[in-house]
Amino acid sequence: MTLAKNQKSSLSRLYKKVSSKRSESSRNLEDESRTSSNSSGSSSLNVNELRTVFDYMDANSDGKISGEELQSCVSLLGGALSSREVEEVVKTSDVDGDGFIDFEEFLKLMEGEDGSDEERRKELKEAFGMYVMEGEEFITAASLRRTLSRLGESCTVDACKVMIRGFDQNDDGVLSFDEFVLMMR
């Protein structure tokens, strides 16, 4: 696994972990603000969630993530970054050259503006391929059930149809790669 991939996946896991630990009251406040806001509401909700993750990582609350703070958070997730790797992560993410990752730099990193969009798309293509039956170009309820079964999850075809329906934008009963990408966001 490359350093960029390791960095991105560790930060993504941290993002999910911290986001899932938000209190119910925070969720209710966000739901209310999302309901009352315009179309940019979903975007600002994402920024709010990223702010929560950033604040969690910024242990000393100085508005910046240091190499030590980054290393500590990755360690909490069961990952490991050497001092050299941490230095490289900070160096590649640190646009203003102050030796830290500020919130704007963190946003760019998490939104894929660090040049890793192609890598992310390639990873998603590989994951998509796991769910697709040979010779097909989409995920069907049967192929989803088969893959989930191989992963130890039992699920009926009808339940898989319901899962697919949630992300099937053109109502054709299957998931295309683009629909899969939306689902994985």
Swiss-Prot record:
Binding positions (Ca(2+) 3): D168, N170, D172, E179
GO CC annotations on file: cytoplasm; nucleus
Binding site for Ca(2+) 1: D58, N60, D62, K64, E69
Domain called EF-hand: residue spans: 45-80, 81-116, 119-154, 155-185
Gene: CML37
Protein name: Calcium-binding protein CML37
Regions that span the bilayer: none
Residue ranges, compositional bias (Polar residues): 1-12
